[in-house]
Design a protein with these regions (language model features):
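Conserved donor-nucleotide/metal-binding helix-loop-beta segment in metal-dependent transferases, i.e.
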Residues: 156-176
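Active-site-proximal specificity loops/subdomain of glycosyltransferases
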Residues: 89-138
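Short beta-strand-to-loop acidic/aromatic patch adjacent to the donor-nucleotide binding site
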Residues: 141-150
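Short acidic, S/G/P-rich loop/turn micro-motifs used as interaction or catalytic elements
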Residues: 44-49, 76-78, 151-154
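Conserved small/polar residues in nucleotide/adenosyl-binding loops
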Residues: 182-189
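A conserved acidic beta->alpha catalytic loop
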Residues: 73-84, 93, 102-104
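Short loop->beta transition adjacent to catalytic acidic/histidine clusters or analogous donor-positioning motifs
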Residues: 36-37, 61-71, 94-95
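N-proximal low-complexity "stem/linker" segments adjacent to membrane-targeting elements
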Residues: 1-58
Length: 190
């Protein structure tokens, strides 16, 4: 059996070279009318000062099919949370920042701890857990994608390929995992 055979409801990112990024994004925009897409970005404040996240935000700004973005912000004081808000305002997609070290999430975490529902340890898992909770509470997304904020080789094709298998109504996938990193943009996208 070939390595790209897909059985079941889980897909892995593949690049068969059949569609350009623009073609995939055009279809995603069409699908977005009926199938809202939301992106989760769990990040540390320190990543705002690195090289990867500014590029990721720049690439996301080139997309037009996302309905909403949830940013989970960790390890940020109040001043840094304000700076993060200013940083992410450049996105042209509506967004929500969950400031994990802020008073509102600390209060929520305390309430959930009393009921045995809060993640035990701080970190990316907890960050993602709260972001998924926000997505569920918003109840508008048909598909949710999540990726790290330290991908140095990020380009918008990665995001398109994360959503495409689960948003395309001709496919029966419920989950898509990414495992391919592209050191440079695809020649088809030039």
């Amino acid at each position: 059996m070939s390595e790209f055979s897909q059985n079941g409801i889980v897909s892995t990112l593949h690049d068969f070279g059949t569609k350009s990024t623009k073609e995939i994004e055009k279809e995603l925009l069409k699908f977005s009318n009926e199938r809202k897409m939301e992106l989760i970005l769990p990040c540390l404040y320190s990543e705002l000062e690195g090289k990867a996240l500014p590029n990721i935000v720049s690439e996301i700004k080139k997309t037009n099919y996302l309905d909403h973005i949830i940013i989970g912000l960790d390890k940020a004081n109040e001043d840094q949370a304000r700076k993060a808000w200013t940083f992410f305002e450049q996105l042209e997609t509506p967004f929500t920042i969950l400031w994990n070290d802020g008073p509102n999430l600390k209060k929520l975490d305390k309430e959930l701890k009393k009921k045995g529902l809060s993640p035990n340890e701080k970190g990316k898992g907890r960050n993602v857990w709260y972001c998924i909770g926000m997505s569920i509470a918003r109840n508008t997304a048909r598909s949710v994608a999540l990726h790290d904020c330290d991908i140095k080789t990020y380009d918008r094709r990665m995001l398109a390929k994360l959503f495409y298998p689960v948003v395309n109504p001709l496919f029966n996938f419920e989950f898509c995992k990414g495992c391919l990193l592209y050191p440079s943009p695809s020649p088809r996208d030039s």
